[in-house]
Regions:
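Active-site and donor-binding regions of nucleotide-sugar-utilizing enzymes
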Residues: 1, 12-185
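N-terminal leader/presequence regions that precede the main folded/catalytic core
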Residues: 2-7
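Acidic anion/phosphate-binding donor-loop and adjacent secondary structure
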Residues: 148-149, 184-198
């Protein structure tokens, strides 16, 4: 619980900083695998829900050049649980960038995958996706509450369930939705099944 609270506090502070220092560009580490990334995965925090919702797709993107833009070092996540067994940390290049460099560094991106368009990197990459004509995919990473921010215009939502998709889209016609399940709940069920089998 303490780790979760620290992640939430850091995300809130990052969000507040990005609003109060508007002239300062959002910075982060950009990892790339391949020469022409077509998918940009964006994270504003490494919370457990974000790691499972946003990094887990790396396992299924073996044939695609990928970029990952994060607030801090992500080496631990690129060489094990979340990255494909085919790839290791050495397959990724790394550089510190600001959001205004995305257009020059990632001209071939077709999909931006994020969990929050209202935080620093999420907001910058939403604008980046609009500028280059890329799709912006939002991934549900936690339970929805009535205070959840609205989805960005024209996005594709990957939701836990049809009910979650319907609730969050709120009847909007500009949002495309897909019910894909929850990686966190899937892993919890697998862990519970494994523990039950060991009894």
């Amino acid at each position: 619980k303490l780790k979760w609270a620290k992640y939430k506090l850091k995300a809130l502070l990052d969000s507040a900083r990005s609003r109060t220092v508007a002239e300062e560009p959002v910075r982060g580490l950009l990892y790339t695998r391949g020469t022409k990334p077509q998918v940009l995965i964006v994270m504003d925090s490494f919370s457990p829900t974000n790691r499972n919702a946003i990094l887990e797709p790396l396992k299924h993107l073996d044939a695609v050049d990928v970029a990952l833009w994060v607030p801090e070092d992500a080496s631990d996540y690129l060489d094990g649980q979340y990255a494909s067994e085919r790839y290791s940390r050495k397959d990724w290049s790394e550089q510190e960038i600001s959001g205004d460099e995305l257009n020059n560094l990632l001209p071939d991106v077709r999909i931006v995958l994020s969990a929050a368009q209202f935080l620093g990197r999420g907001a910058v990459t939403y604008e980046f996706s609009r500028a280059i004509g890329a799709e912006y995919w939002m991934v549900q990473h936690g339970l929805l509450v009535p205070q959840a921010p609205p989805l960005p215009v024209g996005c594709t939502l990957l939701a836990f369930s049809e009910a979650d998709a319907e609730f969050w889209a709120s009847g909007r016609r500009d949002v495309t939705t897909h019910a894909v399940g929850s990686q966190l709940l899937y892993l919890a069920a697998q862990k519970a099944a494994g523990a039950e089998a060991q009894k």
